[in-house]
Structures are given as C-alpha cells and as structure tokens.
C-alpha cells in the first residue's frame, strides 16, 4: 500500500535554535535509511513552508505511520503531520468499462 504524508516544521511553536544541526542531520539520515529500505519512496521539500511531502510504501497504515513517527523531528515534537492519506491506483489508467 502507498500513503502520502505532508508535514510542516512547527516554527510557530519553536524558535529556530530548536532545529539543531544534529536533529536536522539526523532527519536526513533517517529518511535515507527509510528510502534504502524501500519505505520512503519519494521525498519532496515543501516550497511554501518548512516541511516535506513523502510517498510511503508499506504493508499497512500502522507500518507507514511507524516509519514517519521514527523521524527525529517528529519524535522531538518539532514536526506536525498536516496530511496522512492512503492512496490507491488511479482508475483512469485501467481498462474502459
């Protein structure tokens, strides 16, 4: 199954100093691990705010959420999940009925 998450950094609740190089670096490293494991399939940086959109692939929603919740910024409370939705194949590419 695939899932789409959109997150934003909680810059309204935390000062810039809260986003330490260690946390931000750890975030990038963890996303690379999840990508190498085939769980994070695609990652985009948001152009309108700090945060990301991530396409996840997992056997269940619980597995995808666990991967998302393993991110250092999420664990530190610095990341808000704005959208988390399950996806299904687009029917328009299938046979016409």
What kind of region is each of these model predictions?
Residues 1-97:
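Conserved, structured core segments of small domains
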